[in-house]
Structure formats: C-alpha cells, structure tokens
C-alpha cells in the first residue's frame, strides 16, 4: 500500500472528512497524533496506544538523531520495527527542537550548527542531513527542515526565515528525489511566515509550486494567541491545494480542535494531553479536573461519567488522587490513557459531525462545556 489522500465529505464550515492511506494503514482525518518524542508516548505501551485506536503517532528526529542515533534505528529495521509499532508514524525534521532546546545555535543558509542539550557536543543539521536521518528512521510521513522563530518577531525577521525555509524546502525536495522512496515515505513542505498573513500566503504559494504531496503549517502556537494561530492558518490553507493533506503543527487545547478543523486542517499534534496528564490535569466533558485538589479525596466518581475509556470504567477520582499524591508511576499511566482517549474521542465526534454537516453545532456545544 502506497499513499493516497481523498476528501470524502466537506462540511459547510469548510472542514474536510478524509482518508489518508499509508504503507502502515489508513488514517481517518481529521486526525490527532499523540506525541512519542523518543520513540515512545510517555507512560503508554504500544499495546495501550493500539487499544486507544491511535492510527498515527509523532516521533522526533532531533531526539532520535542524538539518542540512540538514526544509524542504529536503521540497522534495527527502521523506527516501526525498533519500537514495535505497526501503524503509521510521522517524524518532524528536528527544526523546532534545534531552535527551542539547543544552546549556541548558529543559522546560515547552509543549515544550523547547534550544541546537543544532552552532552554539549556540536552538530550540524542541513536540509539534506535532516532528510538523511528521516529516511533512515523510515517514518511514513516526514518533514522538511524549517527555521522556527520566536513569536512575535519583526516582519523582516519573519521574511528572512520564511525565505530560508523555502530554499531549504527546495533542497529537501531535490535530495528526496535522489535518495528517498515516494512509495514508502511522504514528504511534507512547511509553510512559515510568522504572524504576517500576507507573508504566509506568499510562502504557501511558493511552496505549492514545489508540488509536495502534503503541507504542514509551522511556527504557530509558540506564544501567539489562538486568534492569531487561526488567522495565520486561514491565510495558509487558503492557498494550499484541496487534494493534499494539511497538518497544523503543535496544537492545541481540546476546545480549539474544531476551530482548526473548520480552517481545512486534516492533522494535528500536541504534547498537551500527555504532559498535562503527568501533572495531574485531566480533561473531561465538563472541563478540566486537577486531581490533586482535596475535593476529590473521597470522590467515588470516575474522572468523567460520560467517558468510555478503560480508566473511567474502573477507577475513582479518589484513587487517582491518591496515586498522584503518592508519586506512583500508575498515576501517569492512567491519567495519560484517559487524556489521549479524550482527545481521540473529540476527533471521532468531529469526523461524525462533518459527515452529517453538523460541525458548527458540535463545536458550539463542545466549547460551551469546556470554556
């Protein structure tokens, strides 16, 4: 099975119901991808993720390049074999981590020199090197290297970064044409442009000329408001081809997911459900539960009485509070399982609403309960 993306239905809001076929299975879109930074979604086994219905997860090129190394993973049969995950995987290029985690980085048109956050060793990541690593990892969907900038940034700074990202996209396309396999991996270009809608549109137009099989929108939700993220996403998607999948990187909160979908987004990822779970923040159909609060000390109810996850079918808030306060590993396991289920359940609801042309009603109801 190679790659094929089809839009099955379109909602009056502009949201798309789709299906993305990959060599490791079908992804029903719009889809949310749990983040498995170092080839693991923290506190979940692969069997847990399969039981949750995860069709695709994200892993991180920067972290896997530094440890255990892409050559080792390649020699172990690639990332799917190495982590024993039979379904689809997306890897980012490592660009965001280089700019957010690394010290003493230096960016030129050739690439970026940086020091590892692990041991201080110096590394150089070019568009070609990023793809060399991603091809070795063997994920289904891979990203070009992009330059991420802080938000907000001056327009000239955003314009320079967008131009460099576009040049890197051209080089990535050329490298993949020589060394990649389009039947096994799908290469996405990334739209940049800071918080400037016209720059986003220009960058998207130029990127589309390179004819990528899919497109991501990067550099958002890194300090800017939800409204700005939506405005920049709208500017980009207005220029992207309707027959290609669109991926909004690094978003978002549960109540925001329908907003992004109405802008024509097909895929999203975020560390929020897993990171929040490890800090005792649980998402429910009536808002957040901070499980450490004393009010839950003798609460026999599940986290969410309307939730169908295995945790809510079995455990009480009182027990989960006890586990969290005692520092038990099981707290992170159960909390994470619930939060991922909650996100995936929202996505199931979104897809069903699009199918019947009722996404606006679904969005209004969800946001009324969660905000």
Locations of regions flagged by a protein language model:
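Glycine-rich phosphate/ribose-binding loops and adjacent secondary-structure elements
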Residues: 179-303
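Alpha-helical packing segments of well-folded alpha/beta enzyme cores
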Residues: 130, 161, 165-168, 172, ...
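Non-catalytic, usually N-terminal nucleic-acid engagement modules in DNA/RNA processing proteins
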Residues: 1-181, 294-297
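Glycine- and acidic
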Residues: 151-154, 159, 214-220, 329-332
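Structural signal for hydrophobic packing residues in well-ordered secondary-structure cores
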Residues: 138, 169, 173-176, 180, ...
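Conserved, mostly hydrophobic/aromatic
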Residues: 25, 57, 92, 134, ...
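Short, electropositive alpha-helical surface patch
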Residues: 155-166, 174, 198-210, 337
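C-terminal extensions of enzymes
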Residues: 1-19, 27-31, 42-43, 146-152, ...
């Amino acid at each position: 099975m190679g790659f094929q993306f089809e839009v099955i239905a379109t909602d009056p809001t502009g949201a798309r119901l789709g299906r993305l076929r990959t060599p490791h299975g079908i992804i029903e879109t719009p889809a949310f991808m749990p983040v498995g930074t170092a080839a693991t979604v923290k506190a979940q086994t692969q069997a847990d993720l399969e039981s949750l219905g995860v069709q695709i997860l994200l892993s991180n090129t920067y972290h896997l390049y530094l440890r255990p190394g892409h050559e080792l993973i390649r020699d172990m049969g690639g990332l799917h074999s190495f982590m024993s995950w039979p379904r689809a995987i997306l890897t980012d290029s490592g660009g965001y981590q280089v700019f957010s985690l690394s010290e003493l980085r230096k960016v030129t048109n050739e690439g970026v020199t940086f020091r590892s956050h692990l041991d201080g060793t110096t590394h150089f990541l070019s568009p070609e090197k990023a793809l060399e690593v991603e091809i070795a990892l063997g994920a289904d969907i891979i990203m070009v290297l992009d330059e991420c900038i802080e938000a907000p940034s001056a327009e000239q700074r955003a314009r320079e970064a967008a131009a460099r990202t576009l040049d890197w996209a051209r080089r990535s396309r050329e490298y993949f044409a020589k060394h990649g396999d389009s039947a096994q991996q799908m290469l996405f270009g990334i739209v940049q442009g800071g918080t400037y809608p016209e720059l986003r549109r220009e960058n998207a137009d130029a990127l589309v000329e390179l004819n990528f099989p899919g497109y991501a929108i990067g550099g958002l939700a890194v300090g800017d408001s939800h409204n700005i993220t939506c405005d920049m996403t709208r500017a980009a998607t207005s220029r992207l081809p309707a027959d290609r999948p669109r991926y909004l990187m690094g978003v978002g909160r549960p109540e925001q997911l329908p907003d992004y979908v109405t802008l024509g987004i097909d895929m999203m990822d975020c560390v929020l459900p897993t990171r929040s779970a490890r800090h005792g923040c649980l998402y429910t159909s009536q808002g957040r539960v901070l499980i450490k609060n004393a009010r839950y000390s003798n609460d026999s109810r599940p986290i969410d009485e309307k939730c169908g996850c295995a945790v809510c079918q079995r455990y009480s808030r009182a027990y989960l509070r006890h586990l969290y306060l005692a520092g038990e590993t099981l707290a992170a396991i159960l909390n994470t399982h619930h939060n991922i289920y909650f996100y995936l359940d929202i996505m199931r609801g979104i897809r069903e609403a699009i199918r019947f042309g009722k996404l606006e009603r679904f969005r209004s109801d969800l946001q009324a309960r969660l905000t």
